[in-house]
Amino acid sequence: MRCVCASIRRTRIIEFLMFFALSSSTASCAPFSVSNVTHASPRPRWLRWHEKTSMAGNPVSLSIATPNGAKSSSICSANTVGFTPDTYTCPDIRDSSTDTLSRSKRISSLSLTKPISSSSESETKVLSAS
C-alpha cells in the first residue's frame, strides 16, 4: 500500500513539473500577455497584464471595437512599474460614432499595442471581452 501511494505521489509531482515547465515556456514567447481586463466604474477603464519585456512603465495604445463597428483609441499610461503586473489606466475611451463613454457599450474586442523597443516597432495583442 505504501509503495502504491509513493508511486502515485511521484507521478503527480512529475505531471505538475511538466505542466509548470510547459506553461512557463509558452508564456515567455509573447512580449506581453493579457491576464485580466476589468472595467472600473465610472472611469477610468483599467487594463492589466503581465510584463514580458523591459518596457514596463511606457505608454501603450488601446483600441476598442464595439459590435456596431465603432472604434476608438486612447494612450494609456502606467500606474505602477516593476516586475509585478503593471496596471494601465485609459481615462478617455470614447465611442467615436456617438462620442459617449465606451463603458456603456458592449465591447467586442480590445487591441493592445505596446512598444517593443525605442524604435517605432510595436507588438499588438488582440483579445475578446464583453
Curated annotation (Swiss-Prot):
Domain of life assignment: Eukaryota
Subcellular localization(s) per the UniProt record: Secreted; Host cytoplasm; Host nucleus
Stimuli inducing this protein: Expression is up-regulated at later stages of infection.
Chief location: secreted
Motif (RxLR): 45-48
Keyword rRNA-binding among UniProt keywords: no
Glycan attachment residues as annotated in the record: N36
One Gene Ontology cellular component annotation held by this UniProt entry: extracellular region
Endpoints of the signal sequence: 1-29
Assigned keywords, A-Z: Glycoprotein, Host cytoplasm, Host nucleus, Secreted, Signal, Virulence
Function in brief: Effector that acts as a broad suppressor of cell death to interrupt plant immunity. Inhibits cell death induced by cell death-inducing proteins, including the PAMP elicitor INF1 from P.infestans.
Domain notes: Has a conserved RxLR motif that acts to carry the protein into the host cell cytoplasm. Lacks the 'so-called' EER motif, which is found closely behind the RxLR motif in most of RxLR effector family members, but the presence of an EER motif is not always essential for the translocation of every RxLR effector into host cells, or for inducing a hypersensitive response.
Family listed: Belongs to the RxLR effector family.
Protein's UniProt name: Secreted RxLR effector protein 68
